[in-house]
């Protein structure tokens, strides 16, 4: 791929499947045009998937520091999720999906409980129990 060819590179739920993420960051930086964007997401609290090729879980701090390390500017990372009960539901979903009605009730209860807890906690719960992260890094 020629250098500085693309305005944007999209990378949704791929990075955790690549053992050489350092090469990915440098290669994406190389192929993005000046002022281009590297946009993507990674799971965090989520079951292993596509095994045996699910290598990493990346934290907010890791994404911010490593994208900057590889020369990206204006790095923004946003937590995805809702709270501890939705995080628990997402881990149980592979089993709950076989009981669709029960699964929907569990999901509703999880949203209600997370909303109730959020009333009493000052910290945004998705910052403590992120299902994943969405990021935008500008060249």
Model-derived features: positions:
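Conserved SAM-binding loop
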Residues: 1-49, 60-64, 135-137
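Aromatic-acidic/polar surface patches that form glycan- and anion
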Residues: 17, 56, 126-130
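Short, glycine/charged-enriched secondary-structure capping and boundary segments
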Residues: 23-26, 53-56, 92
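A structural micro-motif
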Residues: 36, 72-73
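Preference for well-ordered, secondary-structure-rich cores of eukaryotic proteins
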Residues: 40-41, 65, 74-79, 83-85, ...
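Short catalytic/ligand-binding loop motif for oxyanion handling, primarily in non-cytosolic enzymes
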Residues: 46-50, 83-88
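Short alpha-helix
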Residues: 55-71, 77
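A C-terminal cap/extension of S-adenosyl-L-methionine-dependent methyltransferases
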Residues: 84-139
């Amino acid at each position: 791929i020629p250098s500085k060819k693309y305005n944007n590179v999209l990378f949704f739920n791929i990075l955790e499947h690549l053992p050489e993420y350092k090469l990915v960051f440098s290669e994406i930086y190389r192929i993005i045009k000046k002022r281009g964007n590297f946009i993507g997401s990674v799971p965090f609290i989520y079951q292993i998937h596509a095994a045996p090729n699910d290598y990493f879980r990346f934290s907010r701090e890791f994404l911010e520091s490593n994208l900057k390390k590889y020369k990206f500017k204006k790095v923004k990372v946003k937590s995805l999720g809702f709270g501890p009960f939705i995080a628990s539901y997402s881990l149980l979903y592979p089993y709950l999906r076989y009981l669709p009605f029960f699964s929907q009730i569990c999901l509703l209860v999880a949203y209600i409980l997370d909303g109730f807890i959020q009333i009493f906690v000052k910290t945004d719960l998705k910052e403590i129990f992120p299902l994943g992260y969405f990021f935008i890094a500008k060249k």
